[in-house]
């Protein structure tokens, strides 16, 4: 028996290094950590070096803004006219023939539409909140969390996050309106 367990452990050891572990974020966690929540399509991607890390710059054409600060009123949610698109930086990418992959970081795809929970870094430079937990692929009405495909192991209580665009938006609005 012992002879069988040791080889199995050795075989499984490399698999454990392929994932990031993070505390599971609830919808209130995502909303509280976000400066804005948008629905947008990736129109362009390019990777670049910053120190010893590679980042990917994702140009997002915003279709809808669901949250801006603490505002959920659709008539008050606007992007500045000088920047109709957002620049979202994600960890990892390929520059020349060198690539870096960061487990748990969202990998956005050109032409795909996402619901993104974002926080602003430098002016007009945004980052997805809570690794890939803050990104949902949106095909028409259905949402798919990117945590399912981006090697992110979540720990903590599972909280139900709505799986459609309409229900997620309604849940965000309801939560924000409940706050003092």
Identify what each model region corresponds to.
Residues 15-19:
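Sec/Tat signal peptide C-region and signal peptidase I cleavage site
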Residues 20-34, 49:
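Short boundary/loop segments of OB/S1/cold-shock single-stranded nucleic-acid-binding domains
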Residues 44-51, 67-68:
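Short, conserved beta-turn/loop elements at beta-strand boundaries and strand-helix junctions
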């Amino acid at each position: 028996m012992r002879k069988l367990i040791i080889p199995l452990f050795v075989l499984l050891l490399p698999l454990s290094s392929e994932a990031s572990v993070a505390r599971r974020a609830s919808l209130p966690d995502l909303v509280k950590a976000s400066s804005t929540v948008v629905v947008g399509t990736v129109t362009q991607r390019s990777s670049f070096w910053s120190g010893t890390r590679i980042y990917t710059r994702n140009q997002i054409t915003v279709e809808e803004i669901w949250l801006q600060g603490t505002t959920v009123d659709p008539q008050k949610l606007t992007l500045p006219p000088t920047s109709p698109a957002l620049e979202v930086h994600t960890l990892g990418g390929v520059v020349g023939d060198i690539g870096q992959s960061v487990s748990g970081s969202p990998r956005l795809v050109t032409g795909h539409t996402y619901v993104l929970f974002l926080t602003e870094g430098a002016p007009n430079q945004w980052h997805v909140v809570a690794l890939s937990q803050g990104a949902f692929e949106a095909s028409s009405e259905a949402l798919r969390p990117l945590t399912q495909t981006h090697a992110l192991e979540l720990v903590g209580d599972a909280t139900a996050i709505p799986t459609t665009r309409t229900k997620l938006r309604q849940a965000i609005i309801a939560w924000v309106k409940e706050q003092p």
